[in-house]
């Protein structure tokens, strides 16, 4: 009863992710914090592209502003999507909660171990991502300090007073405002990544539970085997529906992030070769590590889900199916046939997100970066 009444925000598998989203009112509540966090980012993001077009600053700061503009666009899209589809996300999280509680209440010690491992991994990833996000925020604020000219952490265009934005006291005022904005953006960008990673890790957990159930068929009596296989088929349907719902929520955003990741990494590579000081080089490397690590985690867990769903059929085949009666063998064969279609996180509703796709993207990024370097050289 205590588990059933558990607040979704308190689910251990999410760590602090949902708590941060609730605090900033992206999910579960609707208050002024949402607008305090999003409004400055939307306004600045609109002016960033104008500033890039009209900029007379050095090339390294223009390139950095391009990176920040794309990053801000990605951040704003995440925040807007959460606000617009808030109730869809909350319904999905409640579905996950019901599945999670079902596994927590299991008497099977192996399932309990699998749940603990997944929870521990999810919390670890979320903490690492938050730490890297905090380091990146510090980099945003400190990067201009090491420049040869006076610039703001984020480029922006200010109508009527744009020519005075680097003069005191305007520069100090805008610098402080942008420094305050940095952690607010981090709480919009990083928790979303952590939430999607947790969704995918839970789908992987469901795959592993199915594999365990199928490999344990030999421990059951003959009259119990058919019922267990039918349970596995029903659970597989739940798993398939879970992944489909996840794709319906995130697939178009994955396409936006696919394009943004390519643009940002290419820009950062270019920034690395034109950085003026060692300190700026270190900060750019920190940017690259953060953005690359965030994307690699997403692609890795999506790739793991892709292959874990294949392993369901392998686990079924590894059972002692030759000892079952004909009807039970047919039921098991039906489950194996259903498992031949892998469960995939889709990018734009079309392409499966996996490490092969990431490798292709990195090859394209490096080719474009090489072209930019030759032109600049």
From Swiss-Prot:
Residue ranges of the TM segments: 35-55, 66-86, 128-148, 173-193, 255-275, 281-301, 345-365
Stretches of the chain found on the membrane's Cytoplasmic side: 1-34, 87-127, 194-254, 302-344
An MF annotation (GO) of this entry: ionotropic olfactory receptor activity
InterPro entries: 7tm6_olfct_rcpt (IPR004117)
Keywords: Cell membrane, Membrane, Olfaction, Receptor, Sensory transduction, Transducer, Transmembrane, Transmembrane helix
GO BP terms: detection of chemical stimulus involved in sensory perception of smell; signal transduction
Extracellular topological domain residue ranges: 56-65, 149-172, 276-280, 366-377
A GO CC annotation given for this chain: plasma membrane
Residue ranges of coiled coil: none
Highest taxon in the source lineage: Eukaryota
Pfam families: 7tm_6 (PF02949)
Membrane topology: Multi-pass membrane protein
Compartments, record wording: Cell membrane
Similarity comment: Belongs to the insect chemoreceptor superfamily. Heteromeric odorant receptor channel (TC 1.A.69) family. Or30a subfamily.
PANTHER family: ODORANT RECEPTOR, ODORANT RECEPTOR 30A-RELATED
Described purpose of this protein according to its UniProt entry: Odorant receptor which mediates acceptance or avoidance behavior, depending on its substrates. The odorant receptor repertoire encodes a large collection of odor stimuli that vary widely in identity, intensity, and duration. May form a complex with Orco to form odorant-sensing units, providing sensitive and prolonged odorant signaling and calcium permeability. Involved in the behavioral responses to propyl acetate and anisole.
Further information: The atypical heteromeric and topological design of the odorant receptors appears to be an insect-specific solution for odor recognition, making the OR/Orco complex an attractive target for the development of highly selective insect repellents to disrupt olfactory-mediated host-seeking behaviors of insect disease vectors. Odor-evoked OR currents are independent of known G-protein-coupled second messenger pathways.
Subunit structure of this chain's protein: Interacts with Orco. Complexes exist early in the endomembrane system in olfactory sensory neurons (OSNs), coupling these complexes to the conserved ciliary trafficking pathway.
Protein name from the UniProt record: Odorant receptor 30a
Species in which this protein is naturally found: Drosophila melanogaster (Fruit fly)
